[in-house]
From Swiss-Prot:
Modification Phosphotyrosine, positions: 373, 690
GO BP terms: intracellular transport of viral protein in host cell; symbiont-mediated suppression of host gene expression; symbiont-mediated suppression of host translation initiation; viral translational shunt
Family, per entry: Belongs to the adenoviridae shutoff protein family.
Upper taxonomic lineage: Viruses, Varidnaviria, Bamfordvirae, Preplasmiviricota, Tectiliviricetes
Protein name per Swiss-Prot or TrEMBL: Shutoff protein
Gene Ontology molecular-function annotations: RNA binding
Post-translational modification: Might be cleaved by the viral protease. Phosphorylated. Tyrosine phosphorylation enhances preferential binding to tripartite leader mRNAs and allows ribosome shunting.
């Protein structure tokens, strides 16, 4: 996380806008800002407060939607800005008549005042020496760095709320710019306009059938020009809808075919396109410029008096030098070598860097996890239900988290079959493009002149070995070792990929289509429709897009997103991928199911401390379980390099599925038995009708209910008849005292555990009296509880399995084992009483 914050800080420091030093207090305007008037001036009467609120609400709506008042914590400086309030009605009438109303409003003043207040607080929170230096010679870079560090990497971490999120900070009240794809367009060349091949996916209606991946399919690989030396960009065996349709006379490369699905048929009828703005996937321009000038062609710099420089004079490696290195003077061999090196520098090295960055084991796992968040799939759906918090609303950018509560993540369930697969595949393709462009943008910004000089020196030293490499693939691998070293790859992988939502990818999709001249509102085209499906039908400049599209198709099947395999009950959150099954799925992990059923059903309390204070108890809460569950990843049963679902494997998993907090199955089994015995005791020994709090069904038999509600003869049930003759106020008192006794007995019966739900208050109508055995059982259980607490004081506190706070599994196991041994020597075991009674 420190690397993420440092990367974010380094990113923002170079891209941050120019911030002036704190300005002096502005001259008094005709009316102060309503936000300052409302916060700094306390009204003396209620009418004044109402006038202030009304004037604040009647101000510019555009300013109120993105500028929020910041509470002024300074003492003297901020007091200078307090201005007396004046009525704003005359000013509003003047603004209505003014043609430049927006510029006459106080939006800019409020914004500058707010930013200066934040910056002043940042300087006050800094060290005294640093603050003095900044006051003497303030620097824009220093102010930007301090402002960014105080906002995004504060020295004191923000306070966390009960649900795990940070408390709202008014200083961060802005819409995150990283949620808009245009924010990345300033880092490098964002688009690459090129003619659309006729062999694109839109003209391949059977591509979805060819893209189906069976079990055992490995990760896709990238090609080279040595392997794919012929490119076909025609329709092939696809049959057009009109037999006499001439492609040369058409003004669009999209051809209406007989096998087109309904979406593609509508797309081809709506638009006529020949070119498309493909998102740029090249390496940073500074790196590519250094590579070209060092290995291939020098930059031409003609003098004013001279003409163009011949190409032979611009070549870095002349024919004579290349002939000496290759030990041959054959022109065909030399020309073929130049083509190989040029292809390796322009195409293959980019594909190798992309393959290295996106297909490592850790990166594939993170991509799968982010896709589970994006599509609310599998274990993320289960964690959201247990924690009662929508985890799919979280989005991030280089470690900066933001909760986007308006992002949608379930609309893909409205699509079926091929339409669903096309949408999911295109969304993952855009997500890979988004991730790669983010990495290239960070790399481009962090490059310095000394880095480029060091790269140029390294390439110049290895020039002969690169030109005399074995083949195109090995040359590209050697080039990637200089351009994209392992340390750089690991640094970028620590901060990427980011959490994203389908709404962000939809905005990205609209952004790409709009730059291509396609209106998304009337045309349901996808950017992946204009990418070829196979390498032999794709020109080399688009091989990177073809590779990402094939990788997106692999990830769709690898994460089990192609179809909806969920069901009802335990299969509501079922997912077949290795991230979920078998260790994070209730249908395949019995221990995890027992642990979920034990949430909020028990509590272990230690004896008081010597000072009389009670230590915090151990209680399995939904938040504790969710935190441990999200970290419950078993790498031994994860297959990142191929599609291998758990249900398709005959052998058992390498690691036995277990719970994530209470890892010992014996503890979970005994907690489950205690809970079950407690419920059976209430159903069999208690009198009356016990209703399920969720469904309202009767949990016990109907005989006791009928007997209690009927009017039996006096000789058959004298006590009950006598009870019915009691006054109404005594019957109400009797029922309330009975509920209290059952509730107290329920707590005593659980020993060290507490009840998760009170069956009496959850729908119980009880009558009658208790026998003397209930009092004896209650006293016996209370003594056992006190003895258990004294024994529990011998064990130290620790951390529970899975990272949750509480006691260790060994301490819990020892306590429950001692309690079980003591109960085995007692013939009238309390846990078995309900079974004998039933």
């Amino acid at each position: 996380m420190e690397d993420q914050h440092s990367a974010a800080s380094e990113l923002g420091s170079s891209a941050a806008p120019t911030l002036p030093p704190p300005p002096p207090p502005p001259p008094p305007p005709t009316s102060p800002p309503p936000s300052l008037q409302q916060r700094q001036q306390e009204p003396t009467e209620t009418d004044d407060a109402e006038d202030t609120c009304s004037s604040s609400s009647s101000s510019s709506a555009s300013s109120e939607c993105f500028v929020s008042p910041l509470e002024d914590t300074s003492s003297e400086d901020s007091a200078d800005t307090v201005l007396p309030s004046e009525p704003r009605r005359d000013e509003e009438e003047q603004e209505e008549d003014s043609p430049d109303r927006y510029m006459d409003a106080d939006v800019l003043q409020r914004h500058l005042l707010r930013q200066s207040t934040i910056l002043r607080q940042v300087l006050q929170e800094a060290a005294p020496g640093a603050a003095a230096e900044a006051a003497e010679a303030p620097s824009v870079a220093e102010l930007s760095r301090r402002l960014e560090a105080a906002l995004f990497s504060p020295a004191t971490p923000p306070r966390r709320q009960e649900n795990g999120t940070c408390a709202p900070d008014p200083r961060l009240n802005f819409y995150p710019v990283f949620m808009l794809p245009e924010a990345l367009a300033t880092y490098l060349l964002f688009f690459h306009n090129q003619k659309i091949p006729v062999s694109c996916r839109a003209n391949r209606p059977r591509a979805d059938a060819h893209w189906r991946l069976p079990s055992g399919t490995p990760l896709p690989d990238y090609p080279t020009t040595d392997e794919v030396y012929k490119i076909f960009e025609g329709l092939g065996d696809e049959e057009p809808a009109c037999a006499n349709q001439d492609l040369k006379e058409r003004d669009s490369v999209l051809v209406e075919l007989k096998l087109d699905n309904p979406r593609l048929a509508v797309v081809k009828q709506c638009i006529a396109v020949t070119h498309f703005a493909y998102p740029a996937l090249a390496l940073p321009p500074k790196v590519m410029s250094t590579l070209m000038q060092t290995l291939l062609v020098r930059r031409a710099s003609p003098l004013p008096d001279e003409g163009e420089t011949p190409l032979e004079d611009l070549l870095v490696v002349s024919d004579e030098q290349l002939a000496r290195w290759m030990h041959t003077s054959d022109p065909k061999v030399l020309e073929e070598r130049r083509k190989t090196v040029t292809a390796a520098c322009m195409v293959t090295v980019q594909l190798h860097c992309m393959h290295t960055f996106l297909t490592s084991r850790e990166m594939v796992r993170r991509l799968g996890e982010c896709l589970h968040y994006m599509f609310r799939q599998g274990y993320v759906k289960l964690a959201s239900k247990i924690a009662n918090m929508e985890l799919s609303n979280l989005v991030s950018y280089l470690g900066m988290l933001h909760e986007n509560r308006l992002g949608q993540h379930v609309l893909h369930h409205t699509l079926k079959h091929e339409a669903r697969r096309d949408y999911v595949r295109d969304t993952i393709y855009l997500y890979l493009v988004y991730t790669w462009q983010t990495a290239m943008g960070v790399w481009q910004q962090c490059l310095e002149d000394r880095n480029l000089r060091a790269l140029e020196t390294s390439l110049a030293r290895a020039r002969q070995s690169l030109w005399t490499g074995f083949d195109e693939r090995t040359i590209a691998q050697d080039l990637a070792a200089f351009l994209f070293p392992t340390k750089l790859v690991e640094t970028l992988q620590r901060s990427l990929p980011d959490f994203a939502s389908q709404s962000m990818m939809h905005a990205f999709r609209s952004f790409v289509l709009e730059r291509s001249g396609i209106l998304p509102a009337v045309c349901n085209a996808l950017p992946s429709d204009f990418v070829p499906t196979v390498y032999r039908e794709c020109p080399p400049p688009l091989w990177a897009h073809c590779y990402l599209l094939r990788l997106a198709n692999f990830l769709m099947y690898h994460c089990d997103l192609a179809e909806d395999t969920s069901g009802e009950g335990l299969f509501e959150c079922y997912c077949r991928c290795n991230l979920c099954a078998p260790h994070r799925c209730l249908a395949t992990n019995t221990a995890l199911l027992n642990e979920v059923q034990a949430i909020n059903t028990f509590e272990l309390q230690r004896p008081p401390k010597p000072d009389g204070t009670l230590p915090p108890p151990f209680k399995l809460t939904p938040g504790l379980w969710t935190s441990a569950f999200l970290r419950h990843f078993v790498s031994e049963d994860y297959h990142s390099d191929r599609i291998l679902f758990y249900e398709d494997v005959s052998r058992p998993p390498r690691v036995e599925p277990s719970a994530c907090v209470i890892t010992h199955s014996a503890i979970l089994a005994q907690l489950h038995d205690i809970k079950k015995a407690r419920e059976e005791f209430l159903l069999t020994k208690g009198h009356g009708v016990y209703l399920d709090p969720h469904t309202g069904e009767e949990l016990n038999t109907a005989a006791p209910s009928t007997a209690h509600h009927a009017a039996p003869p006096e000789e058959a049930h004298p006590q009950q008849h006598q009870h019915q003759q009691q006054p109404s106020h005594r019957r109400r008192h009797h029922r309330s005292s009975y509920a209290d006794r059952v509730r107290s007995e329920l707590h005593a019966y659980g020993g060290a555990t507490g009840s998760s739900r009170d069956p009496v208050s959850g729908g119980c109508s009880a009558r009658g009296t208790h026998s003397r055995d209930a009092a004896r059982r209650r006293g016996s259980q209370q003594r056992d509880q006190r003895q258990l607490r004294r024994q529990f004081a011998q064990y130290p506190r620790g951390t529970g399995g899975g990272g949750g706070t509480g006691h260790t599994d060994e301490a819990i196991q020892a306590l429950l084992h001692q309690q079980q041994q003591q109960q085995e020597h007692q013939p009238a075991q309390e846990l078995r009483r309900p079974q004998r009674g039933s």
